[in-house]
Swiss-Prot record:
Keywords: Endoplasmic reticulum, Secreted, Signal. A motif (Homodimer stabilization) lies at residues 29-38, 44-51. This is Anterior gradient protein 2-A. It comes from the Eukaryota. It is found in: Secreted; Endoplasmic reticulum. Belongs to the AGR family. Monomer and homodimer. Its main location: secreted.
């Protein structure tokens, strides 16, 4: 009887492991690019941008915002962006950074801002919209890709 109970127990344990959903561990990418290296804080991003002479790409978003989620999906699926992003210090935040330089044209999400290694916020790399200049829709993903390229060119020509 004891052998039968042990066998039944091990069968139940094995079945539960087999049926359990495989979950990816939560990373700093929050789904924006799991194969990319992301920093945890704005301060860390600024430090690494300056010390590694790379621009900081800051994405301000919300987990409960459908526009943020749609942009995240487009960003993560765009192979060119994922490759080019390796040339940046990457940070995505779900809170509003307190740096007044990042406010630019107000508080909204999603907002994508570039900061160069001299710690200057690049207000000259906006999205397509006049009311929320630093927001992008999934349809604007190629415009974001072009702005990423411009940020790297500015790095080489201005700094």
């Amino acid at each position: 009887m004891e052998t039968v109970l042990k066998s039944l127990f091990f069968l139940l344990v094995a079945t539960s492991f087999t049926l359990a959903k495989e979950r990816k561990p939560q990373t700093l990418s929050r789904g924006w690019g799991d194969n990319l290296e992301w920093v945890q804080t704005y301060e860390e991003g600024l430090f690494k941008a300056k010390s590694e002479n790379k621009p900081l790409l800051l994405i301000n978003h919300r987990n409960d915002c459908p526009h943020s989620q749609a942009l995240k999906k487009a960003f993560a699926e765009h192979q060119g962006i994922q490759k080019l992003a390796e040339e940046f210090i990457l940070l995505n935040v779900v809170y509003d950074p307190t740096d007044k330089n990042l406010q630019l044209d107000g508080q909204y999400v999603p907002k994508v801002v570039f900061v160069d290694p001299s710690l200057v916020v690049r207000a000259d790399l906006p999205g397509k919209y006049s009311n929320h200049q630093y927001t992008y829709e999934p349809a604007d993903i190629d415009h974001l890709f072009e702005n990423m390229k411009k940020a790297l060119v500015l790095l080489k020509t201005e700094l």
